[in-house]
Curated annotation (Swiss-Prot):
Keywords: Allosteric enzyme, Cytoplasm, Hydrolase, Metal-binding, Protease, Sodium, Threonine protease
Activity regulation remarks: Allosterically activated by HslU binding.
First and last residue of the signal peptide: none
Protein name: ATP-dependent protease subunit HslV
Subunit description: A double ring-shaped homohexamer of HslV is capped on each side by a ring-shaped HslU homohexamer. The assembly of the HslU/HslV complex is dependent on binding of ATP.
Lineage: Bacteria, Pseudomonadati, Pseudomonadota, Gammaproteobacteria, Candidatus Palibaumannia
Keyword NAD included in the entry's annotation: no
Classification via PANTHER family: ATP-DEPENDENT PROTEASE SUBUNIT HSLV, METALLOPROTEASE TLDD
CC annotations in GO: HslUV protease complex; proteasome core complex
An individual GO BP term: proteolysis involved in protein catabolic process
Catalyzed reaction equations: ATP-dependent cleavage of peptide bonds with broad specificity
Species name: Baumannia cicadellinicola subsp. Homalodisca coagulata
Function summary: Protease subunit of a proteasome-like degradation complex believed to be a general protein degrading machinery.
Length: 180
């Protein structure tokens, strides 16, 4: 359980996440880095919601796909989703990935889904609905930067969701896509 949010605005794409890891109802760690840069020269940012070990496995597999497809985000995401859905070992992994590069923002699921959400706003995890609501309100009613919106959305989600804390990892790329 966690909160991962991605916002694209004014030539920037930002993904942020909290750092809480839980087992059942117990907080096991409060400073997990659920958002990281991937691929050559850190051209892709990715965040995960779900099992930590599963997510690190998926990060590694996704980075290999990015290398195989020369950094083409959509192709790498589709190929990862195919493998995730069809490979018996991978099917057991429970996580969602939010990934972005300068052109696209995607959600990758274990069901084989690769989704480019409307207006490139992604929110996943237990605190996702709270962060998404906050981000939409801020996008529609303020001139805040993508980074400010991600930060404020994570704070709001952390105040509401018991599986989200206030330790944040935030990564940013310059973007060519418009988003909100």
């Amino acid at each position: 359980m966690t909160t991962i949010i991605s916002v694209r605005r004014n030539g920037h794409v930002v993904i942020g996440g909290d750092g809480q890891a839980t087992i059942g109802n117990t907080i096991m760690k409060g400073n997990v880095r659920k958002v990281r840069r991937l691929y050559y020269n850190d051209k892709v940012i990715a965040g995960f919601a779900g099992g930590t070990a599963d997510a690190f496995t998926l990060f590694e597999l996704f980075e290999r796909k990015l290398e195989s497809y020369q950094g083409h985000l959509v192709k790498a995401a589709v190929e990862l989703a195919k493998d995730w859905r069809t490979d018996r070992r991978l099917r057991r992994l429970e996580a969602l990935l939010a990934v972005a590069d300068e052109n696209a923002s995607l959600i990758i699921t274990g069901n084989g889904d690769v989704i480019q959400p409307e207006k490139d706003l992604i929110a996943i995890g237990s605190g996702g609905p709270y962060a998404q609501s906050a981000a939409r309100a801020l996008l529609e009613n303020t001139n805040f930067s993508a980074r400010e919106i991600v930060k404020k959305s994570l704070v709001i989600a952390g105040d509401i969701c018991i599986y989200t804390n206030q330790f944040h990892t935030i990564e940013e790329l310059t973007s060519t896509a418009e988003g909100y």
